[in-house]
């Protein structure tokens, strides 16, 4: 197979600071190139998912954005992250869809719940090694 992995996803946003805050403060992701972005040297920032994968956070006037055609993406959580994350996000008032429930994915069955980022993109948060 020629495809061996995923490099990045791009999230268009009208509120860059709100999206940076969401991915950094809510999902505890490292934000890359923030100083360069704020200095106008680069056109977007990125949130580190793993050593191999990033989410680019691109400022876009909504009328300039391509028609949205993404339903969701799924982030895999570490084995202990699920213990408190659901309740922490709920307490912060993050828009959620339902409770933690079993779901099938690339690594088989796991437990997941869904949240939305500030631009309305659905994010599944899944753990394969956690059991309630």
Residue ranges with predicted function:
Residues 4-7, 32, 55, 71, ...:
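A short, local hydrophobic-aromatic micro-motif
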Residues 53-56, 63:
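Conserved segment of winged-helix/HTH DNA-binding domains
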Residues 2, 5-14, 35, 44-48, 64-132:
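Vicinal oxygen chelate
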Residues 39, 64-66, 104-107:
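Short glycine/serine/proline-enriched coil/turn segments at secondary-structure junctions
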Residues 55-58, 124:
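Conserved beta-strand in the GNAT
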Residues 12-54:
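Core segments of cupin and vicinal oxygen chelate
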